[in-house]
């Protein structure tokens, strides 16, 4: 497998801090923000953004985790025996601005599934999307409001956002699977 590190741990820290500042700026006047990480790697990214926002502002940040496994339209193709990790959104989303956090925006199908799952929990005032990487190739009309890095890719290339809590390190890699 041919792999290239695009973002190292230090650069990833700066990228997440920049995203945190952007979220604060575009949520001007908000006393409370709701970050909901999409399982699996969106959750630790949301945790880091929450910590940054609370460190640099007086905005209260509510944090949740969303499992979209059962909302995917490709569930049967990808996961004959899906593992459900559970949703944990310990606050009412109704009337709130909710920022969904994910690692990679690709086809838009994960973001669509996350919106479906979130709307079942209530009626947010607005849903925004924050991703570490936007790699293009959309199949649905979805765009992120906050993007850490735009990485145009070929269809046979993949992006791996690695986070310490899941992968033991923080970095973003581009790779091509062996044929």
Predicted regions and their residues:
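PRPP-associated nucleotide enzymes
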Residues: 1-179
């Amino acid at each position: 497998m041919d792999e290239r590190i695009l973002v190292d741990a230090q650069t990833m820290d700066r990228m997440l801090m920049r995203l945190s500042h952007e979220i604060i700026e575009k949520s001007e006047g908000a006393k409370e923000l709701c970050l909901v990480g999409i399982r699996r790697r969106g959750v630790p990214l949301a945790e880091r953004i929450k910590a940054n926002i609370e460190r640099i502002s007086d905005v209260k940040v509510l944090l949740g985790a969303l499992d979209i496994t059962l909302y995917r339209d490709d569930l049967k193709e990808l996961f004959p025996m899906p593992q459900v990790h559970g949703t944990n959104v310990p606050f009412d989303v109704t009337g709130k601005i909710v920022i969904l956090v994910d690692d990679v925006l690709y086809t838009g199908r994960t973001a669509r599934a996350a919106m479906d799952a979130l709307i079942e929990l209530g009626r947010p005032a607005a849903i925004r999307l924050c991703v570490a990487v936007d790699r293009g190739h959309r199949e649905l009309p979805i765009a992120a409001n906050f993007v850490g890095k735009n990485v145009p890719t070929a269809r046979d290339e993949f992006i791996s956002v690695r986070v310490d809590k899941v992968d033991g390190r923080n970095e973003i890699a581009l790779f091509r699977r062996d044929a």
